[in-house]
Design a protein with these regions (language model features):
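C-terminal cap/substrate-recognition subdomain and adjoining C-terminal extension
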Residues: 180-182, 199-207, 211-224
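Substrate-recognition "cap/lid" segment bordering the active-site pocket of phosphatases
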Residues: 132-184
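Short beta-strand segments
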Residues: 8-10, 17, 125-129, 157, ...
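Conserved SAM-binding loop
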Residues: 187-188, 207
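N-terminal helical cap/lid subdomain that shapes the substrate entry/recognition surface
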Residues: 2-108, 112, 119
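Short catalytic/ligand-binding loop motif for oxyanion handling, primarily in non-cytosolic enzymes
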Residues: 15-19, 23-25, 133-137, 162-163, ...
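Glycine-centered short loops/turns at secondary-structure junctions
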Residues: 119-121, 202
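Acidic, divalent-metal-coordinating active-site segment for phosphoryl/phosphodiester hydrolysis
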Residues: 170, 190-203
């Protein structure tokens, strides 16, 4: 097995809870905004997908900060359901505050895992389908920025493609950001199809199913 130089992580569902799936739960889940305001299940799912498509590939720019993008996101959400006349507790600021309530580590042992990998001399990176504002809240609130160099953070909103793209742009960008060959990277994701795509591009893949399983799989690659 070749030398492993970098471990690249997805964010939602691996390092932090997936904000979208809890704040705007999919059809199979309950909770979040949908239940709090009695919104139609299918409509919330539809609007969530539309807004994801609109912001997943939209980067922060010199004239548009991530906070402005976040406010624009919730303004569009409110307009769709209440046409500028939302009920009490459904303002832009209310939804931003609610977002923070759903920003949590997947497991409290995540920081120790990252520290352990750093102590072994491994470079850590991120490859995530994420918008700018939820990523900033996840990494800022959970104090994860210290583990990842800015150049090693690859997001769909910055690359302009998702991990499902046929061109493998996200995986190529991640390997390039680490300045190592694909074969020297381990990629960790909670979605099996993303892991399979990373492997098809030459990376080692780990399908995340829990912290203990992840540690065992990492040790298998690093100590094998």
């Amino acid at each position: 097995m070749g030398l492993i130089e970098a471990v690249i992580f997805d964010v939602g569902g691996v390092l932090a809870e997936d904000v979208w799936e809890h704040l705007l739960p999919c059809r199979k889940k309950s909770g979040g905004i949908r239940d709090q305001f009695g919104l139609d299940r299918d409509q919330v799912h539809k609007v969530g997908l539309l807004l994801w498509a609109a912001f997943a590939h939209t980067p922060e720019g010199q004239r548009t900060t991530w906070r402005e993008l976040e406010r624009r996101y919730w303004d569009l959400f409110i307009r769709f359901f209440w046409d500028r006349s939302p009920p009490q507790g459904a303002s832009i600021d209310d939804f931003i505050h609610m977002t923070d309530e759903y920003v949590r580590l997947v497991d409290p042992g995540i920081p120790a895992l990252l520290e352990g990998l750093q102590s072994r001399g491994l470079n850590l990176g991120v490859c995530s389908n994420n918008n700018e504002f939820w990523f900033r809240r996840q990494f800022g609130n959970l104090k994860l920025f210290s583990y990842f160099p800015p150049a090693g953070i690859v997001l769909s909103c910055r690359v302009g493609f998702s991990k499902s793209s046929a061109g493998y742009e996200m995986f190529d960008a991640a390997a390039s950001a680490m300045n190592v060959a694909h074969s020297s990277c381990i990629f960790v994701d909670d979605r099996k199809d993303n892991v399979e795509r990373a492997e098809a591009r030459g990376m080692k893949g780990i399908h995340f199913r829990g912290l203990s399983q992840l540690q065992e799989s990492l040790n298998g690659f690093l100590d094998g």
